[in-house]
Amino acid sequence: VWDGSVSTNWNDANNWTPAGVPTLADCVVVPNTANDPIVSGASYDALGLNLTIQNGAVLTVNSTNDIIINDWVNINAGGDLQLNNNASLIQINNNSNTGTMHMDRTVNMRRLDYVYWSSPVTSFGSNAISPGTSAGYIYKWIPTIGTNTNGWGNWSATSETMVLGKGYIVRGPDSFTNTLQNYTQNFVGVPNNGIINMPISRGTYDGINYSTGVSTTLATKDDDNWNLLGNPYPSA
């Protein structure tokens, strides 16, 4: 059990009752204390058999660090797991999680740049990615929509709840300029875990190579096999 009696340092044995930094064999409970735990360092791995974050408590995992849990994560109402940019939650077994976490991902982009995104949490709307971007510039790729007489795929505007494992492409915020700047997306929801199946689709064209009209490189019958997939897990 975390007590935070010394500091916010997860890796300090004196912050735990009984004294000792948790291993993969230890159930980890984070109650509401004056010092919320922070996982920090240079690619440090925090460990636990399972993880419970109680009401009022926040566990923060700093950039480039991981928390590795053998089984499940339970975030009580009013508690929070905060994964900063390039931090990861890694789970060994296919247990279901409960509760809401926050996960940041930062990209460097301009207004007219497009970035590929995939959701690490359940029930996250595609229009919640970069809410400062006009709705008409959020797309998914559909291989079976024809862009020419030969039936190759196409981008399709969307505002759907993000399908786990599917990739989406979103333009930079309307307020951005042509100068590169950071944009941080915050994903909020139940962290994904376990086996996630993503159906693959393709077009039906089976003819000769053809011109797409946008490149001198000819497309082939295999070019409608492309699917845009994304990492559905809260890992860097």
Short names for language-model regions:
Residues 4-236:
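N-terminal exported-region signature
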